[in-house]
């Protein structure tokens, strides 16, 4: 299963928060700010162990390949799968049903985001640590050795991500109900109090300060639960009914094993606590945030063993229900696999768009008016600025060697090689003399030095000027927008984009391929800082 997922994720690449660990944390380490490097929160999470993991991989492999990072996330996923298998084995589920659960959760059960994004190694790893802590506490004969092992795992989880909190909290409820106060102190309080102290002194103060809209929280909570249940079951609108039915079925079964009932309670408490915490910390994102696939995975890690156990129990006890149980199992497995395939296709398309932008951006570092803090004009990569990417190359942490097509290079040139300013010092403008070849009409000088009016030959024709490969121009007419096209030697368009002049009438540009052509929305255009030459027929 893990080998298949590794093969499926071969086209993924660094995204979003990956860069926070690769760039931000490495800068803190290089500056000697060890406390900030290790204990500074990522959002509200204490992520010390994932940070150390990313640092080790970065120092060995750099960012030439995403595979070493993704493999670690998949190994954490393997820890979750083996934990689910162990829980079901301890609950006497047959091997066939254990295999169903592994395949079901193996494809993410609607939470495939975690299987394609290496950064989620912390998210998944904390869940794995929590599941194995539950196994030590609630299966087998109680012993101090097992409790200490569980406490260590809880501590590992706290140092990895806050996704361990629901598992620890659910375990605490069970121990408190059993009045096992010594075990509660060992397993929960010993690792939990240092984490709580960190959160109060460091995490809460330095995490992003966001609103917590109380009016949205209840709906966020219910939306998250219903959406998650539907994704896990694979059928819209019945997920909550199926999960609730499984709870009733499992809790109504007479059992002489108190540990079995405790495990069932933990299985169903974890999603409730997960979405209660998410409703408090993420409700500012709106209800769409409740549908994030990563939360589906967090709930599925305990809901799937519960549903598998209920399915096995129903299958064995009620023969007429077997066709329905089999049908629901097939639908759920198919939905999980389909969700993975769909998410993988979208992720691959997304990586195919953003990776060239990040790889080619450093090659446009000397573009006129270039901003060193430029971050590929994509909100998902705010940490990956041009300056930082250049530094990775200079320090041999990155050697981008991908050969991109002319079309791709042209698109990136329009995104990363075009910069606008509202004002510009005349000396700077003169340092970028821009040649101009008329594509249409004629040019006549204006009274303002270095400014020209270009008029097309026909009233219904757009004025067009070939500006070469790099330069700086000022547009005085039109005032709304113009189009920049990148064309090859034959005049074939490679890419084009509209420039909104309300963001600045001064435009600096450079292209990696072809030349830049300025196209007016009408027959007239007035442009400064150019030196028109002969007309190109």
State each model region's role.
Residues 1-44, 54, 59-99, 173-175, ...:
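Intrinsically disordered, polar/acidic, low-complexity terminal segments
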Residues 66, 99-127:
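Aromatic- and kink-enriched transmembrane "portal" helix at the membrane-lumen/periplasm boundary
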């Amino acid at each position: 299963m893990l080998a298949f997922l590794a093969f499926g994720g071969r086209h993924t690449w660094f995204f979003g928060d990956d860069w926070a660990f690769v760039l931000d944390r490495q800068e803190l380490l290089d500056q000697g700010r060890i406390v900030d490097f290790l204990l500074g929160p990522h959002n509200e999470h204490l992520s010390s162990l994932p940070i150390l993991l990313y640092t080790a991989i970065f120092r060995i492999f750099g960012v030439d390949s995403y595979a070493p990072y993704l493999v670690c996330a998949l190994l954490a996923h393997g820890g979750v799968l083996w934990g689910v298998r162990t829980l079901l084995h301890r609950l006497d589920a047959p091997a066939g049903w254990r295999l169903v659960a592994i395949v079901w959760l193996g494809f993410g059960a609607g939470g495939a985001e975690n299987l394609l994004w290496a950064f989620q190694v912390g998210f998944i790893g904390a869940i794995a640590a929590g599941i194995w802590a539950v196994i030590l506490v609630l299966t087998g004969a109680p012993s101090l050795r097992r409790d200490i092992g569980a406490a260590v795992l809880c501590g590992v989880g706290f140092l990895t991500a806050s996704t361990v909190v629901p598992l620890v909290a659910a375990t605490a409820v069970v121990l408190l109900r059993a009045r096992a106060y010594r075990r509660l102190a060992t397993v929960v309080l010993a690792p939990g109090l240092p984490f709580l102290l960190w959160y109060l002194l460091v995490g809460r103060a330095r995490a992003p300060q966001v609103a917590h809209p109380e009016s949205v929280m209840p709906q966020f909570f219910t939306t998250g639960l219903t959406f998650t249940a539907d994704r896990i079951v694979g059928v819209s609108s019945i997920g909550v009914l199926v999960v609730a039915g499984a709870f009733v079925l499992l809790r109504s079964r007479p059992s002489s094993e108190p540990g079995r009932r405790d495990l069932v309670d933990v299985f169903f408490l974890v999603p409730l606590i997960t979405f209660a915490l998410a409703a408090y910390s993420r409700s500012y994102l709106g209800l769409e945030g409740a549908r994030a696939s990563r939360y589906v995975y967090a709930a599925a890690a305990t809901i799937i063993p519960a549903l598998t156990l209920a399915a096995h129990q129903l299958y064995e006890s009620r023969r007429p229900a077997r066709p329905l149980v089999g049908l629901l199992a097939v639908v759920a497995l198919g939905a999980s696999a389909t969700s993975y395939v769909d998410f993988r296709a979208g992720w691959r398309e997304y990586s195919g768009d953003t990776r060239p932008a990040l790889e080619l951006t450093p090659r446009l570092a000397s573009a006129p008016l270039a901003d060193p803090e430029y971050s590929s004009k994509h909100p998902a990569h705010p940490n990956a600025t041009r300056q930082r990417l250049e530094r990775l190359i200079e320090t041999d942490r990155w050697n981008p060697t991908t050969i991109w097509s002319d079309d791709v290079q042209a698109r990136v040139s329009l995104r990363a090689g075009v910069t606008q300013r509202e004002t510009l010092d005349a000396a700077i403008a003169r340092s970028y003399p821009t040649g101009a070849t008329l594509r249409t009409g004629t040019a006549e000088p204006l009274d303002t030095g270095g400014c020209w009016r270009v008029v097309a030959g026909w009233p219904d024709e757009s004025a067009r000027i070939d500006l070469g490969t790099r330069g700086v121009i000022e547009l005085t007419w039109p005032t709304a927008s113009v189009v920049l096209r990148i064309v090859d030697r034959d005049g074939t368009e490679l890419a084009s984009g509209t420039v909104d002049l309300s963001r600045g009438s001064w435009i600096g540009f450079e292209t990696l391929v072809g030349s830049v052509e300025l196209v007016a929305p009408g027959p007239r255009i007035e442009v400064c800082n150019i030196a028109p030459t002969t007309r190109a027929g």
